């Protein structure tokens, strides 16, 4: 499986056994100015998250795209 990874401009091959791509989003103290923090990666199962954290999981190559807004 290949998934998009945080801080990478190319998709990466996931480690053996990690066949799920995910996009995790959440807010920090700067959310109103910078927008949500986004984490992209691979996992063996869809990660469990706390309240206030968004998660989207998928199981095809490079399916965890995230469109960032234009800088203000």
Swiss-Prot record:
Provide the primary localization. Answer: secreted
Q: In which tissues is it expressed?
A: Expressed by the venom gland.
InterPro entries listed in its UniProt record:
Snake_3FTx, Snake_toxin-like_sf, Snake_toxin_con_site, Toxin_cobra-type
Where found in the cell? Secreted
One Pfam family matching this protein: Toxin_cobra-type
An MF annotation (GO) of this entry: toxin activity
Q: Name one GO cellular component term.
A: extracellular region
Q: List the disulfide bonds.
A: 3-21, 14-42, 27-31, 46-57, 58-63
Gene3D superfamilies in the record: CD59
The question of whether Secreted is a record keyword is answered with yes
Q: Which UniProt keywords apply?
A: Acetylcholine receptor inhibiting toxin, Disulfide bond, Ion channel impairing toxin, Neurotoxin, Postsynaptic neurotoxin, Secreted, Toxin
- SUPFAM superfamilies, alphabetized: Snake toxin-like
Entry annotated with the keyword Iron-sulfur:
no
Family the UniProt entry places it in: Belongs to the three-finger toxin family. Long-chain subfamily. Type II alpha-neurotoxin sub-subfamily.
**General function of this protein:** Binds with high affinity to muscular (alpha-1/CHRNA1) and neuronal (alpha-7/CHRNA7) nicotinic acetylcholine receptor (nAChR) and inhibits acetylcholine from binding to the receptor, thereby impairing neuromuscular and neuronal transmission.
| Protein's recorded name | Alpha-elapitoxin-Dpp2b
Q: Which organism is it from?
A: Dendroaspis polylepis polylepis (Black mamba)
What is this organism's lineage? Answer: Eukaryota, Metazoa, Chordata, Craniata, Vertebrata
């Amino acid at each position: 499986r290949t998934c998009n990874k945080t801080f990478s401009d190319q998709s990466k091959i996931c480690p053996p056994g990690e066949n799920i791509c995910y996009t995790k989003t959440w807010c920090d103290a700067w959310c109103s100015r910078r927008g949500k923090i986004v984490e992209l990666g691979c996992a063996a199962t869809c990660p469990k998250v706390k309240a206030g954290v968004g998660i989207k999981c998928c199981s095809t190559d490079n399916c965890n795209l995230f469109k960032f807004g234009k800088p203000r």
